[in-house]
From Swiss-Prot:
This is 1-(5-phosphoribosyl)-5-[(5-phosphoribosylamino)methylideneamino] imidazole-4-carboxamide isomerase. Keywords: Amino-acid biosynthesis, Cytoplasm, Histidine biosynthesis, Isomerase. It is an enzyme of class 5 (isomerase). One of its GO terms (cellular component) is cytoplasm. Its EC number is 5.3.1.16. It catalyses: 1-(5-phospho-beta-D-ribosyl)-5-[(5-phospho-beta-D-ribosylamino)methylideneamino]imidazole-4-carboxamide = 5-[(5-phospho-1-deoxy-D-ribulos-1-ylimino)methylamino]-1-(5-phospho-beta-D-ribosyl)imidazole-4-carboxamide. SUPFAM superfamilies: Ribulose-phoshate binding barrel. InterPro entries: Aldolase_TIM, His_biosynth, HisA_bact_arch, Isoase_HisA-like, Isoase_HisA-like_bact, RibuloseP-bd_barrel. It is found in: Cytoplasm. The active site is at D10, D132.
Amino acid sequence: MSFIVYPALDIRDGRVVRLRQGDYAQETSYGDDPLPRTQAFAAQGAQWMHLVDLDAARAGGYTLAPLLSSIRAQTTLQVQTGGGVRGRDDVARILDAGAGRVVVGSLAVRRPDEVVGWLEEFGAERITIALDARQDAQGQWQLPVHGWTENADVTLDDLARRYARAGMRHLLCTDIARDGMLAGPNISLYQHLSALLPGVAVQASGGIRDVADVAEARAAGCGGAILGKALLEQRMDLAEALAC
């Protein structure tokens, strides 16, 4: 399985931002024009990037189609993107706008029967299942829902296995406690998921600080790593990360 480094941009009101642990009230802005950043990603050798529509994630209705089209026209990047996917037609529209893969998050927890059907309809290579997880006091990985205020009635392991049986090829898993914290990725979580889900490219997301963390994620069996805040704050060289 190849290992893919995904430089990431989160977009809100047209700006490049980062949220601390997903909290819209804890936002840091990194400028108004995302396109030059994507061009820099490509110039440094990236083949893929990860693009998140934070406005749509909150209110629905994917808003980044014009940006996505510009990225595809002006760079060589393939784009994995999501935010605000509320149904099948949203997936189709985002793919039609030029996405290489569509990220399906909260709906993957709330309506798995429907999302399983999309793996077959659109192809498992075109869908990334994204699960935000938090470890409880008993060591079980739960899936918080409703703004991370309560847990779903299914665990991370059980839902991930269900999607794997249905043909899932790409799983993006974020340890909520590490998101935007630059505290290092939860390597034990990714070792566990990689062993649990043979043949699935598990993407490490949350807490990656430097090239050593990227190398550690790869060694843990991951198929990819999402690089967000560390790149924006120039704590990491993308070309070095791509060489891991």
